[in-house]
């Protein structure tokens, strides 16, 4: 998980019992966020080992949920990025990962579209070959959707509390209704 001030990683071999290792790499106050990420990764060589599969989850507020037709249209994604983040015009790239289907009659596929700096995406793709780069909400929506299938598909709202934010994911019995993150000041928020 690529956070604002650290990288949290786990690695394991599914064929080896008790092989799970956790790595926390604090980020420095380098000249840029991308440089901080680079420094944190290169300071912990275990992060650059050769793995069979690598998933990189990024915690950023710059994301939205869109239908497949929009996710596959680079001009539409550029328009969305420009309208959501006008001060960063042409300075973001979009990565998409499938989330549970939208609710409604069409049941269309949904994607979490995340907007990140081109330099960050370039570094991650060079450093972690064939890594799947996605927003941190992707595994949460998939997990809660799977729980809903096991426990019945009635409408459910799931809340994932973090130190300074809360993730709310809602399903209406037909599919994903909402997935959003809200900043919080403290436990009473």
Predicted region positions:
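Accessory, usually C-terminal, subdomains that scaffold auxiliary metal cofactors
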Residues: 175-189
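Short, surface-exposed loop/turn motifs that are enriched in glycine and acidic residues
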Residues: 110-114, 157, 184
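A short secondary-structure junction signal
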Residues: 124, 169-171, 179-181
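Gly/Thr-rich phosphate-binding beta-strand-loop-beta motif of the actin/hexokinase/Hsp70
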Residues: 1-15, 148-174
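Short alpha-helical interface elements
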Residues: 81, 145-149, 153, 184
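Active-site neighborhood for divalent-cation/phosphate handling
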Residues: 8-146
């Amino acid at each position: 998980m690529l956070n604002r001030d650290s990288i949290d990683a786990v690695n394991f071999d599914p064929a080896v019992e008790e092989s799970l290792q956790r790595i926390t790499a604090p980020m420095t106050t380098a000249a840029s966020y991308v440089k901080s990420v680079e420094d944190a990764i290169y300071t912990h060589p275990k992060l650059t080992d050769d793995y069979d599969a690598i998933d990189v989850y990024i915690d950023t507020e710059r994301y939205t949920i869109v239908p497949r037709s929009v996710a596959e249209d680079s001009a539409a994604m550029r328009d969305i990025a420009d309208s959501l983040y006008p001060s960063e015009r042409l300075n973001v790239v979009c990565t998409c990962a499938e989330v549970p289907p939208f609710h409604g009659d069409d049941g269309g596929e949904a994607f979490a579209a995340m907007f990140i700096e081109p330099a960050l995406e370039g570094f991650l793709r060079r450093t972690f070959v064939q890594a799947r780069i996605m927003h941190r909400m992707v595994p949460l929506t998939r997990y809660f959707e799977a729980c809903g299938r096991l426990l019945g598909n009635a409408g459910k709202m799931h809340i994932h509390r973090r130190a300074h934010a809360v993730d709310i994911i809602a399903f209406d019995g037909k599919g994903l209704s909402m997935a959003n993150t809200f900043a919080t000041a403290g436990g009473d928020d």
